[in-house]
Regions:
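Kelch-like beta-propeller repeat domains
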Residues: 4-8, 18-353
């Protein structure tokens, strides 16, 4: 089952940038929308970097924007996303949400379709904990009215979903990560407005509690965990502009730390941790209508950033996960909002490249 949610056409930023190396085929409605918004051909021409150190892998079974991922027992689980766009007579864009839930085996590069999400969602949070996958929040229908607070658990042994205690308040496009036995949730959007609220779910007590708020209000952020710290990277400001803000929450100290700014401002990015470093991948900037392939590595010990090899195909809104020292990216949009892709890439990070 798939569900459509709608947003005002003014909310959408379309991107046509870079080299005409890869042109994705648009449906008629996508082509017309781009022409209406000022792009002469309406075609998506993503930024491509053939010299990139990233490798092209087996494509997704479907084109998908804004999925999310988590790694469990050496396999990657992909949840939700956006599938398609159409324009209705009232001038609004209807975006089809996905209930797809898929397991990917990096060794064989095969996808296995699992029991669908309890409902079609996009911009969810996904984490793994003690042999289960947890999916939280997200958008279901209209962005400014239907942000979710539901909390679901997936059991791989039974291929079944169960309901968990919902978040105190709804949010989507948030930062989520496991620190010990607690799921920390920070940033994100509620009814299209970025929030700074931070909460934690304690798996031992089965209760939610409030933590100190994040210093900044951001959504569409990247998230990774190293030790006792949750890192929240980049994202979009209340003006929907990409930011270079980086902050971390220290669970043992119960306080936030402001970190050195990222080299490249970006929102709609992915992030992972490998060998104690935090790596931000891709994203975009609505302010200057760009999608970036930048891959930015942060060393928590030296508090320094450096750039790694950029994505082969720049994108934002992709699912990002790590298995061992390899980063995987799935889908996303090489041109903002209306060009889902099935592209999959990997980068092997050796000793902090």
């Amino acid at each position: 089952m798939r569900r459509w949610h709608l947003i005002p056409i003014g909310f959408v930023a379309l991107v046509v940038i870079g080299l005409p190396v890869l042109v994705l085929t648009n449906s008629g409605i996508k082509h017309d929308l781009k022409v209406d918004l000022g792009f002469s051909t309406g075609e998506c021409e993503p930024t491509a970097n053939p010299a990139s150190g990233w490798e092209t892998r087996q494509s997704l079974p479907y084109e998908l924007d804004e999925p999310r991922a988590a790694t469990l027992d050496g396999e990657i689980y992909l949840a939700g996303g956006q599938l398609n766009v159409s324009e209705e007579s009232d001038g609004r864009l209807y975006i089809e949400s996905s209930d797809e839930f898929t397991r990917f085996d990096p060794k064989s590069e095969t996808f296995t379709e699992l029991k669908p999400l309890p409902r079609p969602l996009n911009h969810v949070g996904v984490v793994a904990y003690r042999h289960h996958i947890y999916v939280l929040g997200g958008y279901e229908e209209r962005r400014d009215e239907n942000t979710g607070r539901e909390f679901f658990r997936y059991d791989p042994k039974t291929n079944s979903w169960s309901q968990m205690p919902p978040m105190p308040r709804a949010r989507a496009a948030a930062a989520m990560g496991m620190v010990g036995a607690e799921l920390i949730v920070a940033a994100g959007a509620r009814n299209s407005e970025p929030v700074s609220e931070t909460v934690a779910y304690d798996f031992q007590s089965g209760r939610w509690r409030t933590l100190p708020p994040m210093p900044s209000r951001r959504e569409h952020v990247g998230t990774a965990v190293v030790g006792d710290r949750l890192y929240v990277l980049g994202g979009r400001s209340p003006d929907s502009l990409a930011v270079d803000t980086a902050e971390s929450y220290d669970v043992s100290e119960r306080r936030w730390h402001t970190l050195p700014r990222m080299p490249v401002p970006t929102g709609g990015l992915g992030a992972v941790s490998i060998e104690g470093d935090v790596i931000a991948v891709g994203g975009g900037n609505d302010d200057n209508a760009t999608v970036t392939g930048a891959v930015q590595e942060f060393d928590p010990l030296t508090e320094r950033w450096k750039l790694l090899s950029p994505l082969r195909i720049a994108r934002h809104g992709q699912a990002t996960a790590a298995v061992g020292d390899t980063i995987w990216v799935f889908g996303g949009a090489p041109c903002a909002y209306t060009n889902e892709t099935d592209s999959v890439e990997t980068l092997e990070v050796k000793g902090g490249q």
